[in-house]
Amino acid sequence: MATEYALRMGDGKRVFLTKEKILEELEAGMANASDLGEIPDLSADEIDKLAEILMMPGKAVSVEQGMEVPVTHDIGTIRLDGDQGNSGVGIPSSRLVGCMTHERAFGADTMELGHIDYSFKPVKPVVSNECQAMEVCQQNMIIPLFYGAMPNMGLYYTPDGPFENPGDLMKAFKIQEAWESMEHAAEHLTRDTVWVMQKLFASGTDGVNFDTTAAAGDADMYGTLHAIEALRKEFPDMYIEAGMAGECVLGMHGNLQYDGVTLAGLWPHQQAPLVAKAGANVFGPVCNTNTSKTSAWNLARAVNFMKAAVQASPIPCHVDMGMGVGGIPMLETPPVDAVTRASKAMVEVAGVDGIOIGVGDPLGMPISHIMASGMTGIRAAGDLVARMQFSKNMRIGEAKEYVAKKLNVDVMDLADEHVMRELREELDIGVITSVPGAAKGIAAKMNIEKLLDIKINSCNLFRKQIQ
């Protein structure tokens, strides 16, 4: 009897497949992406590599040593303190505690602060509270800390917003009115996002993470791209990450263009150049998981889309890898075996520059991804590599080489806790354990500025405050 391997369905249910069936599923998933996106197939060696990863006997797998990448985040601390019946685990804790837990306990390379409603529009009435939370976090943390939220253009339509719902207008055959409603909503999205981030940047945030861009279709993406463009023009040093909501931009409007390119119907490899053109530092491409297909089918499809996006992108790509995207099952508690295999495959086959950790419980998301492919933050040198990706748009190889040269170590040493523990204390750039007298927070980041020859926004704010 042929050997069967334990895999997952797209909803997380365990399924057992033979090697022949796994290869068949991989080929089919890859072909689906190739057909839809009009992109090249994966090579036979790449298909074999994916099969090898899926058939590994261990419950958890990881990238080869030296191939680790930085991680970024969606939903911030909500996975810890949130309790809305999805992936939050309802731990009563402040957002400062949540952010520092990710930095010091999970070994995150970056982190983000976010509002419980996690959209830009609801932040407007409480922006002063968000600014205070950001200042306190920046004073205590070393890793890059973003402000994250969804553009979420749906909130600008009735009954939540001022503009009539274009879906209702379309049903009444009021097409022109529907277009105008979307265009007005996009303008307000741009305005509100820029206003919120002006306040947060003045309070020390390293940058912004646009999560689930284009969730409401092409007008949502249009508004977000113009927000990125405006923020880049006003704040040349702001870290900007733009993550997508889905693999294909839905043409709710159909006629909107950015830089002469129609937004409706764009696939990840076509989205990347526009996001870079707008001024983002890092692009977060997405491939949706099909819950009725196997993890082999979903993974090959996702890897094929992401490989094409990485090759087409002028900026680093941090693939979105929460539940339901990136070959990961749609389950609030993502299976560790599926998450770590998808994480490894994205790094080793798709060649991504980083992983954007998305929705899922703490063990299934940040812990699993960081164990599988992360650089472990200030336990090693993950925060330093991430800063070079965001401050200079460096791809993963260039960023690692730059940091290694500054530290006078080998690239392999950047994820070596033994090497970096002693070196971080010697350079006074912040250590993960509480060492009396060692530089922490702003002081550590000021030393990082000198080491990497960059400027850090929270340090600039501190310098202004003591003049």
Curated annotation (Swiss-Prot):
It comes from the Archaea. Pathway: One-carbon metabolism; methanogenesis from dimethylamine. Its EC number is 2.1.1.249. It is an enzyme of class 2 (transferase). Pfam families: Dimeth_Pyl. It catalyses: Co(I)-[dimethylamine-specific corrinoid protein] + dimethylamine + H(+) = methyl-Co(III)-[dimethylamine-specific corrinoid protein] + methylamine. InterPro entries: Dimeth_MeTrfase_MtbB. GO terms for molecular function: dimethylamine methyltransferase activity. Keywords: Methanogenesis, Methyltransferase, Pyrrolysine, Transferase. One of its GO terms (biological process) is methanogenesis. Catalyzes the transfer of a methyl group from dimethylamine to the corrinoid cofactor of MtbC. NCBIfam families: dimeth_PyL. Belongs to the dimethylamine methyltransferase family. This is Dimethylamine methyltransferase MtbB1. It comes from Methanosarcina acetivorans (strain ATCC 35395 / DSM 2834 / JCM 12185 / C2A).
